[in-house]
Amino acid sequence: MMARRDPTSWAKRLVRAQTLQKQRRAPVGPRAPPPDEEDPRLKCKNCGAFGHTARSTRCPMKCWKAALVPATLGKKEGKENLKPWKPRVEANPGPLNKDKGEKEERPRQQDPQRKALLHMFSGKPPEKPLPNGKGSTEPSDYLRVASGPMPVHTTSKRPRLDPVLADRSATEMSGRGSVLASLSPLRKASLSSSSSLGPKERQTGAAADMPQPAVRHQGREPLLVVKPTHSRPEGGCREVPQAASKTHGLLQAARPQAQDKRPAVTSQPCPPAATHSLGLGSNLSFGPGAKRPAQAPIQACLNFPKKPRLGPFQIPESAIQGGELGAPENLQPPPAATELGPSTSPQMGRRTPAQVPSVDRQPPHSRPCLPTAQACTMSHHPAASHDGAQPLRVLFRRLENGRWSSSLLAAPSFHSPEKPGAFLAQSPHVSEKSEAPCVRVPPSVLYEDLQVSSSSEDSDSDLE
């Protein structure tokens, strides 16, 4: 019976017995602790988790059975567009395609509205909006109302140029008004007459019988009331103080009107007439050049009916340039006579060359005025218009050593200095009083001395 046993079966039994013994034996390696026995202080170096070490079987890197394998979602062919898009035929569009077409047409229909708004901003008349329904017209109407003031703003820029010119003229008139506030009523009347002149007359400022460039220069002076600036004439004249130039500008504008009414009555030079006469270049003052004194002669000079004073415009050019030709209109003392103080130089009429050089002496002011041929007593000091001081006469006498001496003489006030007869009648009266203590000198010698002294003063003034 023993011979009948199969050796293969016996070998199988042996293997089974060995496996059972191995299972009964204790495990050789450390057993994995239960979940409640995990130590949170341990950290696995492989997976980075806490509670086990890298040698533990709980590590998913060691035991892949416990690891969670990411499950694949699978492949969906519907999500991927493998076939290219083919253009559809628009002959029979579906309902969805119709809605899309309407949405695309709406912005296209708003283009004419945008053009209309652009025309409104540019100031052009807007075009008629297309009949697109209530939704298309309402927004355009709202925008038109909101942008209404824009065309007014653009068109209002053009007429703003005229108000600027009006403002400048208003400032000039206000400046003249400020000057008129400090002037007398007679001087205001002269300025009102100057404003009535045309612009062409203001530029020329001369009548038909005023052919001299110096007279043309006088026409511009009324415009320079607030800040007067006098340019030098051809012959060269001196600067004028601002106080003298303001009043002179007011009177120059009124001069052409009175001259047109009545021509020159006398050839006796007056202060406003030869304002720019070059004569000997003497420092002769002009009557209206400074502030008016409170005297009757000054008021008569500013009075328009007094027309004999308007005759000096007919002075020939030889008399204006008499300094070079040897025919001086006025006589002037040498610089030694001006040592009394900064005052205007005296004047002598050319009608009285044989008399003793007794001339009107003006109250002192800052600087000498323009050379003029003045025949009446005038005050140029700014404060003299309010003081009412009596005019002074200065007597110049030539000494034996060639020098001059001056002395002040009280002179009676003139009542009508405009009339040449009155002045000539009173001038000898004063000269007779002063001729007693002085020595009579030939007029030719006096002319030569005065011409030399005036030329030296001109050179000094040019250097200044």
From Swiss-Prot:
Q: What is this protein called?
A: Protein FAM90A15
Compositionally biased tracts (Low complexity): 180-197
InterPro entries noted in UniProt: FAM90, Znf-CCHC_6
Show the disulfide pairing: none
Q: Which gene encodes it?
A: FAM90A15
User: Composition bias, kind Basic and acidic residues: at what positions?
Assistant: 74-89, 97-114
- According to the record, the residues making up region (Disordered) are 1-42, 70-389, 415-437
Output the superkingdom of the source species: Eukaryota
Q: Which organism is it from?
A: Homo sapiens (Human)
The similarity annotation says:
Belongs to the FAM90 family.
Q: Anything else the record notes?
A: Primate-specific FAM90A gene family, thought to have arisen during multiple duplication and rearrangement events.
A Pfam family matched in the record:
zf-CCHC_6
